[in-house]
Regions:
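Short, glycine-/small-residue-rich phosphate/pyrophosphate-handling segment
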Residues: 70-118, 122
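N-terminal beta1-alpha1-beta2 submodule of the flavodoxin-like/Rossmannoid cofactor-binding fold
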Residues: 1-47, 51-70, 117, 125-141
């Protein structure tokens, strides 16, 4: 899934949890992103690092992916999290690129770790590259 293509922002209506379970009510290319992610073996996120976080485009895709969870809560790792809708738990690889300070790297690491837990992904691998062109070398070194 490319975050570069235009897609609507999550409106926070939670229809994907209760009205149209597992599907966003927006009828665009991200409508079934939750179930599509659940079918993957590995999720690879490539993002420009924006103040220690995902770019707005990648964040939009992540926000629209909340259908991977349910509106109910459970304990995981001693914390309360939403229950997961799907049994498959893909691996997660994140590569941030750009001029990134040490503080931004720490923030990006924290965000990636929390997203990994919240979305039910596993085995986080985190990389940093100076520019987008360097991502390939970092991921396939």
């Amino acid at each position: 899934v490319s975050a570069a293509d235009k897609a609507l922002y999550c409106q926070g209506c939670f229809h994907c949890w209760v009205k149209t379970p597992g599907e966003c009510s927006y009828k665009d290319r991200l409508q079934k992103i939750g179930s599509r992610l659940a079918q993957c073996e590995e999720i690879v996120l490539l993002s420009r690092c924006c103040y220690g976080a995902f770019s707005p485009e990648v964040k939009r895709v992540l926000d629209r992916s909340i259908a991977v969870s349910l509106p109910f809560f459970t304990y995981r790792g001693g914390e309360i999290h939403h229950m997961l809708r799907y049994k498959n738990h893909p691996k997660m690889t994140v590569c941030f690129y750009g001029e990134i300070t040490d503080f931004e790297k720490k923030t990006a690491q924290d965000i990636a770790e929390r997203n990994c837990v919240n979305y039910g992904f596993q085995n986080l691998r985190l990389y940093f590259a100076e520019e987008a062109a360097g991502v390939k070398e970092v991921l396939f070194a």
